[in-house]
């Protein structure tokens, strides 16, 4: 019997502000595709500006999934992301369309593409509560430093603001004696799909300028009011509020910094995050990179995907 044909999936990755959204929609139009967000924060309703969520106008009629599926006070795990996205891939494929995953959350995307197994192990609730208490009393950086001591690779990958994942990595080490990064490393070798993995990059200074400009635009669009709405709803120690763009403005509302300092910190954290994203993708995934410093490469990328996945686009003759 012949080998079972794997589902085709195109994946567009890259750092924040590099131009993934427009490219993905152009590709979806050309390739009869539907888009799955690979961003762990665009899942939250009412968190639109700070997550640079794709707008209805930008979607231009292309279906998007994994956007606005949770309330900000709800938690969300990589295991749930994996399950939901794999279901979307099946359903999109069954409709004769091409699933296109777009985003910047490396671990989440990797968990879908590779044969990751997530245990239902409840872990150690007492230890978890101790770490949560430490994070509240001594700050998230203190707990993140504890992770750096036992699992530096996970600490590099997980931002200090993502307290839930930092504590989960500590908990895995505490209960099993094994690093979270080592557990994942063992599972990374088998792709489950026929994948075309595209990465966008650009000159670092240009990218950083774009990030700074994006933050200014977010403030003009009403980021302060968006975060104030969450703050006034009493949303505090939730996973969603650890996101870059929200934590910094929360510091302002809690009188820890001035608004100017909050915006400056947001720009700094966004640039650092972009750098971490690029490091992750380059170290962890077999990506074909396209430099878009001098402008978009839509036609070139389209030809590459057609060849890699043996597809015909609507632009093909």
Swiss-Prot record:
Annotated keywords: ATP-binding, Magnesium, Nucleotide-binding, Transferase, tRNA processing
GO biological process: tRNA modification
Enzyme Commission number: 2.5.1.75
Amino acids binding substrate: 16-21
Enzymatic reactions: adenosine(37) in tRNA + dimethylallyl diphosphate = N(6)-dimethylallyladenosine(37) in tRNA + diphosphate
Cofactor(s) annotated in UniProt: Mg(2+)
TM ranges: none
Matches recorded under InterPro entries: Dimethylallyltransferase, IPT, P-loop_NTPase
Role, per record: Catalyzes the transfer of a dimethylallyl group onto the adenine at position 37 in tRNAs that read codons beginning with uridine, leading to the formation of N6-(dimethylallyl)adenosine (i(6)A).
HAMAP family: IPP_trans (MF_00185)
Name of the featured protein: tRNA dimethylallyltransferase
Organism: Bacillus cereus (strain ZK / E33L)
UniProt lineage: Bacteria, Bacillati, Bacillota, Bacilli, Bacillales
GN (gene name): miaA
């Amino acid at each position: 019997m012949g080998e079972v044909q794997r589902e085709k999936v195109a994946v567009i990755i890259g750092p924040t502000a590099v131009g993934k959204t427009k490219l993905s929609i152009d590709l979806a139009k050309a390739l009869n595709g539907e888009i799955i967000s690979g961003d762990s924060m665009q899942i939250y309703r009412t968190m639109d500006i700070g997550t640079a969520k794709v707008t209805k106008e930008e979607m231009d009629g292309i279906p998007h999934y994994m956007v606005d599926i949770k309330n900000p006070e709800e938690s969300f795990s990589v295991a749930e992301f994996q399950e939901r996205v794999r279901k979307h891939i099946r359903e999109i494929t069954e409709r004769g369309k091409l699933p296109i995953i777009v985003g910047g959350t490396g671990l989440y995307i990797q968990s879908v593409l590779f044969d990751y197994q997530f245990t239902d192990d409840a872990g150690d609730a007492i230890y978890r509560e101790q770490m949560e208490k430490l994070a509240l009393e001594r700050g998230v950086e203190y707990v993140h430093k504890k992770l750096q001591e036992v699992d530096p690779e996970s600490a590099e990958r997980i931002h200090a603001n993502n307290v839930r994942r930092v504590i989960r990595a500590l908990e895995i080490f505490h209960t099993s004696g094994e690093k979270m990064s080592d557990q994942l490393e063992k599972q990374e070798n088998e792709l489950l799909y026929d994948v075309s993995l595209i990465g966008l990059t650009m000159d670092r200074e240009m990218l950083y300028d774009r990030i700074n400009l994006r933050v200014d635009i977010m403030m003009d669009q009403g980021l302060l009011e968006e975060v104030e709405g969450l703050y006034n709803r009493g949303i505090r120690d939730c996973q969603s509020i650890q996101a870059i763009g929200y934590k910094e403005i929360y510091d302002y509302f809690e009188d820890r910094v001035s608004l100017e300092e909050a915006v400056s910190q947001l720009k700094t954290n966004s640039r650092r995050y972009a750098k971490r994203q690029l490091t992750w993708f380059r170290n962890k995934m077999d990506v074909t990179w396209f430099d878009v410093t001098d402008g978009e490469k839509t036609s070139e990328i389209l030809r590459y995907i057609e060849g890699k996945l043996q597809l015909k686009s609507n632009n093909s003759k």
